[in-house]
């Protein structure tokens, strides 16, 4: 089943944790869940150019804390923090509570599966040859320390009449090993011939301790792929 299931979902509670971290009673759960969906939709729409990999939402008492993981934090913050203030107002309208937005910089976007997938999708939309885009992403990831990477592209590749799937892999990507730190990302390229799907599996090594927060700690300690950039109260 490791070949079929989402690698992140398979490892939740082992070495990965949820992107929405809060508890609610029966009466509030659906409302808060819809709020999370709307928050992510608004932020992803506003931050198209910011290379956002993930959005983590936490809800301490009567507050909403949103952490935006971005490869371009300057685009999120804006001039003198103007853009981040606008985002806070929009999120506050949805949640009707105090909002705190943290920006976390991704220092190595080549080692983030979501950003790699989006980069390839953007290249396909610009009519870059799909094999060249895939090989370039594989080489960049391996050069920066990935232990393995696999990329799948499917659809009318190169404008072909018949849709097909092509993939590249380098190194090892152990999908059945639960202690393996396997990142997974998907993206869709909207080309003139139709849509093309891009999937990326990226193996960064093994996490030996049983800690769902292990990956987040590695990211925030500065030795990983990202570091905290700003806390906008």
UniProtKB/Swiss-Prot annotation:
The keyword rRNA-binding applies. One of its GO terms (cellular component) is cytosolic small ribosomal subunit. GO terms for biological process: translation. GO terms for molecular function: mRNA binding; rRNA binding; structural constituent of ribosome. InterPro entries: KH_dom (IPR004087), KH_dom-like_a/b (IPR015946), KH_dom_type_2 (IPR004044), KH_sf_prok-type (IPR009019), Ribosomal_S3_C_sf (IPR036419), Ribosomal_uS3_bac-typ (IPR005704), Ribosomal_uS3_C (IPR001351), Ribosomal_uS3_CS (IPR018280). SMART domains: KH. The keyword Ribosomal protein applies. It holds the Pfam family Ribosomal_S3_C. Keywords: Ribonucleoprotein, Ribosomal protein, RNA-binding, rRNA-binding. Residues 214-233 are annotated as: Disordered. Residues 39-107 form the KH type-2 domain. Binds the lower part of the 30S subunit head. Binds mRNA in the 70S ribosome, positioning it for translation. Belongs to the universal ribosomal protein uS3 family. Part of the 30S ribosomal subunit. Forms a tight complex with proteins S10 and S14. This is Small ribosomal subunit protein uS3.
